[in-house]
């Protein structure tokens, strides 16, 4: 039955989407994700240092195909519930899944150290399992995975890259936080008010550019707890601030204040070369690793125009599939009931990835 692998991939894709959104999985569909799995917390050495990671393994398939799933900018790292649910669902489809922790991104720093960890993780998993591995990166991790795949050192270890809600050019994303707009490749403009989260991550990463050096140690915990969305801890951290520090912290948290916007613009100018080093833009025209691009139409942290720019730059032989979907926001499924066609397009896109991941 030549059509069965594609049919199975579509059933698995539908089941995975149901599982991660907390919806019941129909019995006939659930059989496609019925492999019992085990998890194992591990560490492995790399040139980037010891990497903490978790393996999700289908118990009855010791030689199953492989997939790395990279977490986004979140303090829970590989323990973030959406990530663990997705990794477990993919493993139940018969994939060996590795989720390496990216210490920089876990601490709200998008930097070159994470590119190194991503490349080293792909190399370690490829050597352990005997062949190149698929790599799925969420949010900024997806863009960094593309940079790692373009590195000649790590390129042979990448089977494909799936970038979900990821950046093409960091300076464009930083400018979006200032303006709520971004130009698309076709000349139209994406207009969507930016979520505060993206600007807050920039502030946290470059706090020395926003407050005096003497105030950094006191203000950073306030900003950190605000990013964690822990209001009680944020209030507790504010107690130790003096009046000047309290005013500085509140100004930072108000990402639309004129003073904060001026500082954000200054940071974009000051760190432009660093941002270029964290951007797939300029590296994609010669990339030969197969690429899948997925973005939420309503993404207000990294705008969907970023995926359109990546698709515009990638060679046609490299770009396997691209979808900007109204079913997704940033990394979450939208709460509103999607249309049947939009839901099917997302299922089909994920099925293409499942089929690629399942090929040894």
Task: Show which residues each predicted segment covers.
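Short beta-strand immediately N-terminal to the catalytic nucleophile in serine-hydrolase-like folds
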Residues: 135-138, 162-164, 294
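Catalytic nucleophile-loop/oxyanion-hole region of alpha/beta-hydrolase
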Residues: 78-86, 99-134, 149-152
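Short, surface-exposed "cap/lid" segments of acyl-processing enzymes
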Residues: 59-90, 101-102
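Short beta-strand/loop motif that positions the catalytic acidic residue
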Residues: 287, 293-295, 299
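Alpha/beta-hydrolase-fold enzymes
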Residues: 147-241
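N-terminal cap/lid segment of alpha/beta-hydrolase-fold proteins
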Residues: 14-62
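Gly/Ala-rich beta-loop-alpha elbow adjacent to hydrolase catalytic centers
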Residues: 137-145
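C-terminal catalytic histidine-bearing segment of alpha/beta-hydrolase fold enzymes
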Residues: 175, 237-276, 281, 308-312, ...
């Amino acid at each position: 039955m030549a059509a069965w692998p594609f049919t199975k991939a579509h059933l698995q894709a539908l089941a995975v989407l149901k599982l991660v959104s907390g919806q019941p999985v129909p019995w006939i569909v659930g059989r496609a994700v019925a492999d019992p799995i085990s998890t194992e917390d591990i560490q492995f050495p790399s040139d980037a240092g010891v990497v903490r990671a978790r393996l999700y393994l289908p118990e009855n398939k010791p030689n199953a195909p492989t997939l790395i799933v990279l977490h986004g900018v979140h303090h829970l790292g590989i323990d973030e519930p959406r990530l663990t649910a997705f990794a477990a669902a993919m493993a139940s489809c018969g994939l060996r899944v590795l989720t390496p922790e990216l210490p920089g991104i876990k601490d709200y720093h998008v930097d070159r150290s994470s590119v190194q960890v991503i490349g080293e993780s792909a190399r370690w998993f490829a050597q352990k399992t005997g062949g190149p591995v698929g790599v799925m990166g969420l949010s900024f991790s997806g863009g960094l995975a593309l940079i790692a795949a373009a590195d000649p050192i790590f390129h042979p270890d990448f089977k494909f890259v799936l970038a979900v809600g990821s950046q093409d050019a960091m300076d464009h994303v930083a400018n979006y936080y200032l303006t709520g707009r971004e130009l698309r490749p076709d000349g139209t403009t994406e207009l969507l008010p930016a979520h505060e989260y993206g600007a807050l991550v920039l502030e946290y990463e470059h706090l020395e550019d926003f407050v005096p050096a003497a105030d950094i140690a006191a203000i950073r915990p306030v900003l950190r707890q605000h990013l964690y969305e822990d209001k009680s801890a944020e209030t507790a951290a504010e107690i130790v601030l003096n009046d000047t520090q309290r005013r500085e912290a509140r100004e930072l948290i108000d990402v639309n204040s004129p003073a904060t916007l001026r500082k954000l613009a200054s940071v974009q100018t000051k760190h432009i070369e660093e941002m270029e080093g964290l951007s797939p833009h300029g590296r994609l025209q010669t990339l030969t690793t197969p690429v899948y691009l997925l973005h939420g139409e309503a993404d207000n942290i990294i705008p969907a125009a970023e995926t359109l720019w990546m698709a515009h730059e990638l060679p046609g032989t490299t770009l396997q599939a691209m979808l900007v979907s109204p079913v997704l926001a940033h990394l979450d499924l939208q709460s509103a009931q999607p249309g049947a066609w939009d839901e099917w397009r997302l299922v089909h896109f994920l099925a293409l990835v499942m089929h690629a991941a399942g090929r040894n």
